[in-house]
Each structure stands twice: as structure tokens, then as C-alpha cells.
Amino acid sequence: MVQALNCIVAVAQNMGIGKQGNLPWPRLMNDFKHFQRMTTTSSVPDKQNLVIMGKKTWFSIPEKNRPLKGRINVVLSKELKELPHRAHFLAKSLDDALKLTEQPELANKVDMVWIIGGSSVYKEAMSYPCDLKLFVTRIMQDFECDTFFPEFDLEKYKLLIEYPSVLSNVQEEKSIKYKFEVYEKNH
């Protein structure tokens, strides 16, 4: 059984995370590098992190970048019958995806589990009975969005003042200010 989950997301002030299958803001290189570093870096030699994403998130990744390198890619879908091209695993639910980590072929290969979207996958992960960290890139302005991050209770989530390898100062790229935040919920 998975002891902890990590969610990583970039959100606008209005809690928007997407528009028509894309990010609603221009690509922010330092945020992209932060996402890569956090989801790829394993704390255990010879293990990889596992990234879980919904079908729409998988197909929003440019084909040349699928699967996300250096990570075990799991796509969640109740509709898909076949594994999407180049994905490593297909699961019907978050529970099924997490059970994969107990299978012999993955049991000794997976370090951390990262939820990378979309909205319904985040919502399911946030109600999962385990410790959870939310790695939030807080975009400090509104953007027009059609997909939103689920509301979360700040009474249950503690904002960590510092976290290893996460910058705490405000960043700015392409006239967009943002900051990295880490929240923790203990089960």
C-alpha cells in the first residue's frame, strides 16, 4: 500500500489549471524545470518515480515528449481499452494505478508516486487515505481557464515554510510572477 502521494500542479489565482487541453499561460521555463526535477529525481538509487495522469493530460503532452522520460508513466482512463502508444501502464482508477506498485515487476522499482493531472485525478488523490504533499506553482494572476484545481481545506493542509530544492522566492518570466509552495497533509 502506498504510504504517500505527491501532487504537482501550476494554478492561476482563480485556481485554473488548463484551457482547451493546454496551459492557459505561456510556458514558464523555470516552472517546467521544477516539474521535471521534482517528478524525475528519485531519493533511492536504482529506482524511478511513477507519474499518474488522466487520459487528457497524457494526450496534452506533445507526442515527441511521451512518455515522460526517466519516469514510469501510468495513464488513468475508464474508457480506453488499450494502452496508449508509448505509455507504460493503463489503469481504470487511482486505486488500480497504486496497486501496480505492488506488482512484482514494479515493487522494487518505484520510489515516489506523483499525480500530474488532471482535475479529477487531483481530486481523487486528495481524498486518498495517505500522507499527501501538494507542490503548487502559484501563478500570481488570473487566466481564462476551463479546467480548475479542486478546492482544498487549508485547515487540513499545512504550508511548509521551506522544502529541500524548492525555491521560496517569487519568480518572474515573460512578465508573469509566480512562486513555488509545498503543502502537506498527514493522514
Curated annotation (Swiss-Prot):
A GO MF label: NADP binding
PROSITE patterns the record matches: DHFR_1, DHFR_2
Pathway: Cofactor biosynthesis; tetrahydrofolate biosynthesis; 5,6,7,8-tetrahydrofolate from 7,8-dihydrofolate: step 1/1
Enzyme Commission number, as recorded: 1.5.1.3
Alphabetical UniProt keywords: NADP, One-carbon metabolism, Oxidoreductase
Domain of life: Viruses
CDD domains, A to Z: DHFR
BP term (GO), one: dihydrofolate metabolic process
Binding site for substrate: D31, F32, K33, H34, F35, Q36, R71
Record-annotated DHFR domain positions: 4-185
Keyword Nucleotidyltransferase: no
Entry binding sites for NADP(+): 10, 16-22, 55-57, 77-79, 117-124
Catalytic activities: (6S)-5,6,7,8-tetrahydrofolate + NADP(+) = 7,8-dihydrofolate + NADPH + H(+)
Cystines in this chain: none
Database matches in PANTHER family: DIHYDROFOLATE REDUCTASE (PTHR48069:SF6)
The family this protein is said to belong to: Belongs to the dihydrofolate reductase family.
Entry function: Key enzyme in folate metabolism. Catalyzes an essential reaction for de novo glycine and purine synthesis, and for DNA precursor synthesis.
Protein name (database record): Viral dihydrofolate reductase
Organism: Saimiriine herpesvirus 2 (strain 11)
